[in-house]
Design a protein with these regions (language model features):
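N-terminal secretory signal peptides that target proteins for export/translocation
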Residues: 1-8
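Bacterial N-terminal signal peptides
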Residues: 11-24
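Boundary at the C-terminal end of the N-terminal hydrophobic targeting segment
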Residues: 25-33
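Divalent metal-binding segments
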Residues: 34-45, 49, 53-318, 333-335, ...
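His/Asp/Glu-enriched, well-ordered alpha-helical/loop segment
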Residues: 249, 377-387, 394-417, 421-422, ...
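Secondary-structure transition/capping motifs at alpha-helix termini
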Residues: 287-296, 321-330, 381-382, 404-415, ...
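Glycine- and charge-enriched low-complexity intrinsically disordered segments
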Residues: 583-588
């Protein structure tokens, strides 16, 4: 615990320094028009897909004061335009307008750190910092890694790349990296974010010794492997991650990723992952507001932050109330709380029921279930919406039992407890989720990237092919949303939609075809149903009078293109609270 607290103090100091020095770097205003608050503007379009059953399509939408005034056609809006006067904006007449996309599970600080470095993962990545092709074999990975290391020119910090995964790239430990790069400091950041492998030169450069980690059970010093709590020994030796200029530019990269994906509302599903939630919140708020970002971010307090800082439940609730008092236009905290059930799916630490993993290894519980239940009950009783990080079917079973306990102790209607991630469940569990009134925030990208490898090495084809069983949820009527958990998947709702509709894996295989979803259900999972899952259906998610005027503007109609072409649909940009925000031409 002492080493953890020391880590938190170190990171907190770095974040405070970042706040004091880097703010001017983020002060550039985002490319966004200015519209008078009381001006009535009517946007016309080739088609407006409203996600409203009573009027599914329209061709004109009137907005004022950041909200939707009326929807229909220019003719049907005449009662407004003739009496109030309006400016007709026809720039979208050859485009498709949808409700602003929602990503209900991101982590802004992760891209702020990771986009400082090149990506080299099994999958391809298109980022504000460049194009990063994937490597799916050990040979391809080593070839690309060697080329990237050769380009590294800053001798003051190790070469770091994010995206390494042994299932694709083979086992690379300290000795292997020493042989490949005997004189160059090299660190491989695991695709899960929860692990790092380093060579001798890197450990020497950052000044980490074996004595520093002797008592840490999540460090294998011989292999240069640090995971989960072992990262607390490593990160404090890497202050360059929080260098003011580097981190500020990384946060701007996150904002650009949100915009490029057509997202107008995102949920940070775990504020304080680097140990100082107050400083992190302030930084996110300043960057979003000073740049007038065309999106809002809703911050979610997380159980692991409070436990790692030694806070009681009562102290946690007091802190959350204090944070909420600082809510701003684009960055806010409402009444939601995140629980952690099992381990990361990318690391093979999810909890699976019998027969478990083929190789016999076991998953982990992030906290003892008794502790999770205690915190869940307190926040449930206080009226919070609960979100629970849940990957395997054993974890889903534990969450279902937890929900039954909560309802028995303190019955609540319309609680919308959200199962987050949804890597694998059974049909019976999905039925129970429906009966219990739960909702699901799923990452359909898991099937795309992990299904083949899990089928071959960890679960077998029956369970591996059925990862992320969204078709079951659609048939049962369980409300579900899609999320990226950025950077666990690209912050691109259309990519998530494509993964769910097509179920084509990274290797080009169609697996679990009965778990595909319809295009309509998939679009709702990034608009109206996503709003329902997060409890914001009165404000966002569809285009109707009274809601916020948040739109995503596409070049093609996702209902009309072939399912295989959904991912390729070009995004013009967004409209945030009535104000157009086009993407730079190079990003369209």
């Amino acid at each position: 615990m002492v080493s953890v607290l020391r880590t938190l103090r170190h990171l907190g100091a770095a974040m405070v320094l970042l706040m004091s020095i880097s703010l001017p770097l983020a002060a550039a205003t985002h490319a966004q028009e200015q519209i008078s608050d009381n001006e009535l503007v009517v946007y016309t379009a080739k088609k407006i897909i409203t996600m409203e059953p009573a009027m599914p399509e329209a061709s004109a939408v009137a907005v004022a004061d950041g909200r939707i005034v009326a929807v229909g056609t220019l003719e049907s809006l005449q009662s407004w335009t003739s009496q109030k006067g309006a400016r007709i904006d026809r720039r979208f007449e050859d485009k498709i307008i949808l409700p602003g996309f929602i990503d209900p599970h991101v982590h802004p600080s992760l891209p702020a750190v990771l986009t400082q470095f090149p990506f080299l993962a099994p999958d391809d990545w298109s980022l504000p910092t460049g194009e990063f092709p994937g490597a799916k074999t050990p040979a391809a990975y080593l070839t690309a890694l060697t080329a990237l290391v050769a380009q590294h020119s800053d001798s003051s910090i190790p070469f770091i790349t994010w995206g390494y995964h042994p299932l694709w790239h083979g086992k690379l430990d300290r000795d292997a990296l020493n042989k490949l790069f005997p004189n160059q400091p090299v660190m491989l950041w695991h695709r899960s974010f929860h692990e790092i492998v380093a060579n001798d030169a890197a450990l020497a450069l950052i000044g980490l010794t074996e004595d520093d980690v002797r008592d840490n059970r999540m460090v294998n010093w011989h292999e240069g492997h640090f995971w989960e709590l072992g990262m607390f020994a490593l990160i404090p030796k890497m202050p360059f991650l929080f260098d003011p200029a580097r981190f500020a530019h990384g946060m701007v990269n996150f904002i650009d990723m949100v915009h490029r994906g057509g997202v107008t509302t995102a949920l940070d599903m775990g504020i304080g992952i680097f140990g100082n939630p107050t400083a992190e919140t302030t930084l996110i708020r300043h960057t979003m507001e000073s740049r007038q970002a065309p999106a809002r971010v809703i911050l979610t307090p997380i159980i692991s932050d409070f436990i790692s800082r030694g806070r009681t439940i009562a102290q946690a609730m007091e802190e959350i109330d204090e944070w909420r008092a600082g809510n701003s236009h684009r960055v806010l905290i409402d009444r939601r709380f995140k629980l952690m059930m099992d381990g990361a799916i990318y690391s093979g630490l999810a909890q699976f029921g019998f027969p478990g993993y083929i190789d016999g290894h076991e998953g982990v519980w992030m906290n003892p279930l008794s502790i999770t239940t205690e915190w869940a009950q307190a926040f449930w009783d206080a009226g919070y919406q609960l979100h629970a990080h849940t990957n395997g079917d054993a974890s889903a079973a534990a969450l279902i039992e937890l929900l039954k306990t909560l309802q028995k102790n303190t019955p609540r209607a319309d609680h919308r407890l959200a199962l987050e991630h949804f890597a694998y469940t059974t049909e019976d569990q999905n039925r129970q989720l429906k009966t219990l009134g739960a909702v699901v925030s799923a990452n359909p990208y898991y099937h795309f990237i992990l299904s083949d490898m899990y089928s071959e090495q960890w679960l077998g084809a029956d369970r591996g092919n059925q990862m992320v069983r969204l078709g079951s949820l659609e048939r049962l009527g369980v409300p579900f949303a899609f999320h990226s958990d950025s950077p666990m998947a690209p912050l691109e709702p259309l990519t998530l939609l494509s993964a769910a509709v097509n179920r084509i894996t990274i290797n080009g295989n169609l697996t679990g075809d009965l778990e595909r979803v319809s295009v309509d259900a998939g679009l709702r999972a990034i608009t109206s149903n996503a709003a329902w899952v997060i409890g914001w259906e009165d404000e966002i998610g569809s285009i109707r009078a009274g809601k916020k005027a948040d739109f995503t503007v596409l070049e093609s109609d996702p209902y009309k293109v072939k399912p295989s072409q959904i991912k390729a649909i070009k995004i013009w940009g967004t409209v945030f609270e009535g104000v157009p925000a086009p993407l730079p031409a190079a990003a369209r």
